[in-house]
């Protein structure tokens, strides 16, 4: 269960423009015409004392300044052509398989051109029962979404601690509330060799009552915890905020928001 997306490398071109100004009468006469690249003009003779002047102007610095501080047109093109990546981590055992995939947070564009977080990201857990030796029936998979707070509970578990999460997808949504119950339990194995994940699903709408159990070794659980800690700032959108910080904008942004509580606290 892996997908690989790639995009062809993009080439970036920069041009150097050379502007030659011929102003010496020794080289040009009043009847001469200079033609280059579709440009034609009449040359007016100057005094014999005038010297030949060559002016060279490079646009490379302009290009790199735009790349450094952001060019609106190039950023829009980058948004259109930037590749997307789909990742997940899977654990396969004899009775079931578990795949965990991160889901990105959602932002809304403001009139000012900035973006505001509207929904935090989460981790999607997919449990599939075994259908044979090294075969799993993903058509019967059960899913469970971990919020950032629930992820925090997992990463803070002690060696002998356990946790339990209860979800009702239809809670607060009318008559279907309580008809679907999902319970995820994470408990240490009796011999201390790891933990087990047990997902129980009761769906009265589809007449489903199923439980999927998968043991996780210490090493596998350590990989999960490391990945969870890494992805948390991205799920709450703080990584996007950190990447948008520019030193030259910090004073301007803080001064433009005097109602921000931090300004009042540290300005005392």
Curated annotation (Swiss-Prot):
Keyword Electron transport attributed: no
Function, as annotated: Single-stranded DNA-binding protein that functions in both chloroplasts and nucleus. In chloroplasts, maintains plastid genome stability by preventing break-induced and short homology-dependent illegitimate recombinations. In the nucleus, is recruited to a distal element upstream of the kinesin KP1 to mediate the transcriptional repression of KP1. Can bind double-stranded DNA in vivo.
Signal peptide: none
Motif extent (Nuclear localization signal): 171-185
This protein's name: Single-stranded DNA-binding protein WHY3, chloroplastic
Gene source species: Arabidopsis thaliana
One cellular component term from this protein's GO annotations in UniProt: chloroplast nucleoid
GO molecular function terms attached to this record: DNA binding; mRNA binding; single-stranded DNA binding
Any one biological process term the GO annotation gives: DNA repair
Compartmental location: Plastid, Chloroplast; Nucleus
Mutant lacking the gene: phenotype: No visible phenotype under normal growth conditions.
Family: Belongs to the Whirly family.
Subunit structure: Homotetramer.
Entry keyword set: Chloroplast, DNA damage, DNA repair, DNA-binding, Nucleus, Plastid, Transcription, Transcription regulation, Transit peptide
Pfam families: Whirly
Lineage, opening ranks: Eukaryota, Viridiplantae, Streptophyta, Embryophyta, Tracheophyta
Xref: InterPro entries: ssDNA-bd_transcriptional_reg, Whirly
Keyword Cell division found: no
Inducers of expression: By salicylic acid (SA).
């Amino acid at each position: 269960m892996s997908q690989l997306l790639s995009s062809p490398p993009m080439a970036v071109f920069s041009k150097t423009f050379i502007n030659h100004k011929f102003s010496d009468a020794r080289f040009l006469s009043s009847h001469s015409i200079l033609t280059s690249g579709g440009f034609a003009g009449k040359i007016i003779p100057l005094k014999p004392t005038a010297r030949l002047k060559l002016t060279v102007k490079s646009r490379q610095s302009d290009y790199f300044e735009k790349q450094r501080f952001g060019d609106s047109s190039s950023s829009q093109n980058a948004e259109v052509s930037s590749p997307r990546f789909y990742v997940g981590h899977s654990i396969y055992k004899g009775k079931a398989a578990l795949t965990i995939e991160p889901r990105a947070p959602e932002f809304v564009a403001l009139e000012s051109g900035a973006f505001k977080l509207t929904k935090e990201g989460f981790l999607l857990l997919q449990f599939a029962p075994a259908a044979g030796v090294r075969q799993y029936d993903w058509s019967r998979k059960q899913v469970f979404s971990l919020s950032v707070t629930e992820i925090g509970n997992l990463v803070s578990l002690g060696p002998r601690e356990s946790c339990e999460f209860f979800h009702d997808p239809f809670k607060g949504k009318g008559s279907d509330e309580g008809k679907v119950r999902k319970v995820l339990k994470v408990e240490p194995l009796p011999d201390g060799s790891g933990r087990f994940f047990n997902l129980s699903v009761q769906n009265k709408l589809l007449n489903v009552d199923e439980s999927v159990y998968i043991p996780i070794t210490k090493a596998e659980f350590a990989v999960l915890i490391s990945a969870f800690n890494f992805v948390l700032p991205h799920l709450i959108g703080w990584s996007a905020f950190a990447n948008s910080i520019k030193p030259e904008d910090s004073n301007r942004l803080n001064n433009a928001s005097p109602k921000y509580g931090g300004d009042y606290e540290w300005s005392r």
